[in-house]
Amino acid sequence: MKFVDEAVIKVQAGDGGNGVVSFWREKFVTKGGPDGGDGGDGGDVYIQADENLNTLIDYRFQRFYEAERGQNGSGGNCTGKRGKDITLRVPVGTRAVDIHTNEIVAEVAEHGKKVMVAKGGWHGLGNTRFKSSVNRAPRQKTMGTKGEIRELRLELLLLADVGMLGLPNAGKSTFIRAVFAAKPKVADYPFTTLIPSLGVVSVVPEKSFVVADIPGLIEGAADGAGLGIRFLKHLERCRVLLHMIDIFPIDQSDPVQNALTIIDELEQYSEKLANKPRWLVFNKVDLVSEEQADEIIQEVIDALGWEEQYFKISAVNRQGTKELCYKLADFMEQLPREEQEVSEEEKVNFMWDYHPDANQGEVITEDDDDDWDDWDDEEDDGHVIYVRE
């Protein structure tokens, strides 16, 4: 199945049902009083995470989703039926972003998690609600409010512990082939990897972690150049980044400049991503002498001012890959997972407030020259009940 990690859809919550003007009619009861019921609330729109899905391809074909409208009220103080909700199933790790405000409306990172993305309209009030000691035959009602309409961009973010980044042909996919059973395409030309891929590394039965491989970055990626910018978002949930550096590039470019390019693109894309734990991994050490490799590595470390961990490997020969995986597994145990806390400022405000609108909604008055003289008017559209003697 084609991997689709973005889709734009439009969702519309159901409108609220209208209140109704009605009066109780019964034999021998000349003035039964108002009995108009309220309308029903409109249905809401939700997204729900489903671990059985791994792509957003379905939302490329159907782009409009609408919840059911609430039914109008009726006589006999009958409240209209609430509109049915609609739930959109998406892969685990999907977030919904409002394309107009760029705010994150919802994010589902666990199987079964369900979040509202569009709120249904508030029901209208029937004339019974307006009855008082001075207005015993009210002809006022309110209309239901409109349901919320949103245009959303669904973004699928892969859930992985370790994210790999580097220039094209740095050896990321070769490393993937070396450490687990997945066999991504490997070749000696740039952008061999076209879509992100995931793999599970099992060091020992009780120690494992998930690695995400994305297409290589190039200079200007943060501004949209190359393929990597589209997939950088998949690294946002990774707990540690592996920065793969080719010490013997096939295009004879400078490893120092290549390393600086990646860090610069990370910082331009997201400060949060740039501040994640990051390890340097120097690949292809088998292509040069040990002294030459150490010299190149030292130049890179000095240029970056690097004081953290770094590793020397040869992915094609699996030299140093096992030790790196053990180090990563130990690091995963020590590093706690980020807890997603929603602050007051981050909470999504819907376009209209659910309860206040009930009091501020438009009041509809049915005109009549004489409210008190029309109790027995057969042309009135009030609710009539006939009772057998």
UniProtKB/Swiss-Prot annotation:
Keyword S-adenosyl-L-methionine: no
All copies of domain Obg, residue ranges: 1-159
GO MF annotation list: GTP binding; GTPase activity; magnesium ion binding
Keyword presence, Zinc: no
Keyword annotations: Cytoplasm, GTP-binding, Hydrolase, Magnesium, Metal-binding, Nucleotide-binding
Entry EC no(s): 3.6.5.-
Region called Disordered, residue ranges: 359-389
GO CC terms: cytoplasm
Compartment(s): Cytoplasm
Positions that bind Mg(2+): S173, T193
GO process annotations (BP): ribosome biogenesis
Enzyme class label: hydrolase
Compositionally biased tracts (Acidic residues): 364-381
Pfam families found in the cross-reference section: GTP1_OBG, MMR_HSR1
OBG-type G domain boundaries: 160-333
Residues reported to bind GTP: 166-173, 191-195, 213-216, 283-286, 314-316
Cofactor list: Mg(2+)
Primary localization class, coarse: cytoplasm
Biological role stated in the UniProt entry: An essential GTPase which binds GTP, GDP and possibly (p)ppGpp with moderate affinity, with high nucleotide exchange rates and a fairly low GTP hydrolysis rate. Plays a role in control of the cell cycle, stress response, ribosome biogenesis and in those bacteria that undergo differentiation, in morphogenesis control.
UniProt subunit comment: Monomer.
Family: Belongs to the TRAFAC class OBG-HflX-like GTPase superfamily. OBG GTPase family.
NCBIfam families: Obg_CgtA, PRK12297.1, PRK12299.1
Entries under PANTHER family matching the protein: DEVELOPMENTALLY REGULATED GTP-BINDING PROTEIN-RELATED, MITOCHONDRIAL RIBOSOME-ASSOCIATED GTPASE 2
Name of the protein in question: GTPase Obg
Gene: obg
